Amino acid sequence: EILSGLVGSEMCIETEPYFLHQKELDPTYIGTTTVQKCVRTNDIDNIGDARHLSFFEMLGNFSFGRYFKKEMCAWAFEFSTEVLGLPKEKLYFTVFEDDDETIEIWKSLGVAEDHISKLGEEDNFWRAGPTGPCGPCSEIYFDQGPEVGCGKPDCKPGCDCDRFLEYWNCVFTQFDGQEDGTLAPLQTKNIDTGMGLELSLIHIS
C-alpha cells in the first residue's frame, strides 16, 4: 500500500483508492486538497522551454462523489478572477471534444464562446495510465499576449507557441479504464485538479 511519496509526476496515486471506493473519505469533508512536488518525466524533452520546468509544485483539489463539473468550474472561475485577480478576458478554456456540458457551464459563468476550444483525447482526456480512473478534462489558459505568440491568425490554446499558457487542469474522473480499452463508469462522478503553483505566480506577478 502506498501512503505517500517524496515526489510525483503529475498524478496523485494516493487518491486512486478513493475514486474506486476501496477507501472512503470522512463524510465530514466534501473533498481534500494537496500540494505535490513533481518531477517531469513524461515530457522531459520539453524541459527548458517557456512552458515546462524540471520540477514544480502542483496544487490539487479532489472530490469523491461530493461535487462535480458545475461546482468545480464555478469555483475555478471564481478563484482565477477574484482570488488571483486574473482578468477574465485573458482566460481561455479547452474542453474534451464530446463534452458539450462543460462548454455550457463555462458559458453560463460569463465565458465568451470564442474563448472556449474543443480538443481531442490526447489533450483533454486525462489518464493516469493504461487502466484505472480517468475522464475528460477542461484546462484553463492565460493569454500572455500576441507578442510571445506565433503570429498565426488561428492561434489558440493547444498551439505550440508560448502565447497561451495552461495553469489549471480540471479532470472529471468518472470512468475506470479497462484493459480492453473500454470505459466503465465509476461508482461516483469525481473531481481531480492540478494547478501549477509557479505558472500561477507568473500570471499574477
Q: For each predicted feature, which ranges?
A:
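Residues forming anionic-ligand binding surfaces in small-molecule and nucleic-acid pockets
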Residues: 35-64, 182-184
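Charged, often glycine-rich, active-site loop that binds/positions anionic groups
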Residues: 8-13, 102-106
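N-terminal structural subdomain of ketosynthase/condensing enzymes
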Residues: 17-39
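Short, charge-rich binding segments
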Residues: 29-31, 45-48, 83-85
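Single conserved hydrophobic/aromatic residue that forms the stacking wall/gate
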Residues: 1-7, 12, 202-203
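Active-site cavity-forming subdomains of large catalytic enzyme subunits
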Residues: 57-73, 79-201, 205
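RNA-binding basic/glycine-rich loop and surface signature characteristic of RAMP-family CRISPR effectors
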Residues: 15-16, 171
